[in-house]
């Protein structure tokens, strides 16, 4: 079943699959699990706590506490769910629990305070009660949202606060009378004081006004003298500036007159110089014309011959340049051909070297693969023969045909020497009563008969003994 809690509620789930208690806003409730709902809304608890001060004066302390689960602390919610949620928030059980904590802490606190301290220090007293009660409520996951301590009330038969109120009223009335008398006295004294101060201030202001008027008159005279002096100084400065300007003007007029005369003289001299220059230019041009005419007459033939020689020399130079360029082109072509031949030779050798390197790499890889395979083969043999290295060696020698090769070498060595050959036999043959079933084993028996002399011959030639599992050599004395 799927359960969903309201905004101010929590689901408390216990049972199968849950170690202790689980709080959720919404959850599936499976068989074997139990689910209850508790409300988080705070509740107002109103109490009239009867307490006694340090002077043994009883009084009643009306108070209203707004208390509910602490929603911002998961551990407090767990405590509340376990301890308080099974009971109704308005039940006598919860009410008595909260009232007992508040009354107990309030009585303990009031017992250490005088009535005057409680009456006058209401704010501090309220904070002390709040802190101590909250400390106890933390055990149940409860939180004080608000605490209001009302006015202290007398216990029937004890009129302390009534008398204290009357005392306060009388003190207030007497203080009011004193305040009225003091106010009247201060009013009359203040009135006379204000009249005297008014007359004094008026005389003082008149004297200060006369002094200020004299000061202002003197300052005005000073300012007039200062202004007249400044005007005279300014007039003198302007007259000096005018005289200086007139002097500068006279100097400039004299300079301008002299400059005009010099300019007229320079202009006259410049005209004469220009006239002489033009005359010389005319004469020079006439001389140049005569010279050019003579050059044209005497040098025309030489110029033609010179141009002809120059053209011939240029043609010879052009031919030689072209021949040199042709030779250079041939040399370049030959060098490029040699370079191409060298590149092709280098490429061919490079390819051969790479092919040889590739073949060597593959051969090495094959050798490594073969070695790994042989190693695995030998390791398998060794494991199969119980790590008997001697048996593995003998097997490899037999499997590799080493004994046959030794026999062949020995046969080649004694060929033509007529060696002694011993033949072992048990004397039986087909005519000696051997059955047809035993004839098939004749060849095998012949091989076994031949092994002892073969082992003996191998031992005589190499000094090696056959393995124990294949047999032993015959006794030398037999």
Swiss-Prot record:
Keywords: Cell membrane, Coiled coil, Lipoprotein, Membrane, Nodulation, Palmitate. The keyword Lipoprotein applies. It is found in: Cell membrane; Membrane, Caveola. CDD domains: SPFH_flotillin. Residues 235-277 form a coiled coil. One of its GO terms (biological process) is nodulation. A lipid is attached at residue 35 (S-palmitoyl cysteine). One of its GO terms (cellular component) is caveola. May be palmitoylated. May act as a scaffolding protein within caveolar membranes, functionally participating in formation of caveolae or caveolae-like vesicles. May be involved in nodule formation. This is Flotillin-like protein 1. It comes from Medicago truncatula.
